[in-house]
Amino acid sequence: MHLSLLKAKIHRATVTHSELNYEGSIAIDGLLLEATGIREFEQVHIWDVTNGARFSTYAIRAEQGSGIISLNGGAARHVQVGDLIIVAAFASMSEDQAKTFKPNLVYVDAHNAISHTNHSIPTQAA
């Protein structure tokens, strides 16, 4: 059996651009792609924390160090500049691989610069 596990996420990134007339995708600062291990053209899920929208698209590289998070094409209809989003990628793996797998979790500040990284999410308490 194969499981689909969270491979990587960019947590609470701020949308900097929304380009309806650009080819569909999400342009992500190259530093964030490298930190997460998300590859260009890889499918990603977008969860808009601000308005609750959830959809998928593919990642393309934006200028390294630019802080750009740009939703393009049809995806631009789901967000507004200034919205907070989570970008997530998943990987399929065997149960044995899943036992030792650790996701790349990248947390960003208000300018989409990396504030810290982790490989686990703290246990949620009441």
From Swiss-Prot:
Record carries keyword Cytoplasm: yes
CDD domains assigned: Asp_decarbox
Chain positions with Pyruvic acid (Ser) modification: S25
Cofactor note: Binds 1 pyruvoyl group covalently per subunit.
Cofactor section: pyruvate
Keyword annotations of the record: Autocatalytic cleavage, Cytoplasm, Decarboxylase, Lyase, Pantothenate biosynthesis, Pyruvate, Schiff base, Zymogen
Any Gene Ontology CC annotation: cytosol
Pfam family of the protein (one): Asp_decarbox
Catalytic reaction list: L-aspartate + H(+) = beta-alanine + CO2
Protein localization: Cytoplasm
Top enzyme class: lyase
Job of this protein: Catalyzes the pyruvoyl-dependent decarboxylation of aspartate to produce beta-alanine.
Family affiliation: Belongs to the PanD family.
PANTHER family, sorted: ASPARTATE 1-DECARBOXYLASE
Name assigned to this protein: Aspartate 1-decarboxylase
Species per Swiss-Prot/TrEMBL record: Xanthomonas campestris pv. campestris (strain ATCC 33913 / DSM 3586 / NCPPB 528 / LMG 568 / P 25)
Gene name of the encoded protein: panD
